[in-house]
């Protein structure tokens, strides 16, 4: 599959304390990209898709405890 001109590659890493939230973050990221390490994914998507992914992840995490880069 070839990339679209407006797609970019993003490296997304996370540190999530709670097992349930961690599983949800991994499942969400897995639906957008490929796992390259336990807490690191490569996502190739458009800016609009990245914003949708970001909104989904923000709804999952506890911002005081977790981080996503």
Language-model regions, residue ranges each:
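Basic nucleic-acid-binding interfaces
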Residues: 1-11, 17-69
């Amino acid at each position: 599959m070839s990339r679209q001109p407006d797609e970019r590659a993003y490296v997304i890493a996370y540190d999530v304390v709670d097992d349930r939230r961690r599983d949800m973050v991994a499942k969400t990221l897995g639906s957008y990209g490929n796992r390259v390490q336990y807490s690191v994914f490569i996502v190739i998507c458009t800016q609009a898709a990245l914003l949708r992914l970001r909104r989904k992840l923000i709804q999952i995490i506890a911002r005081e405890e977790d981080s996503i880069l």
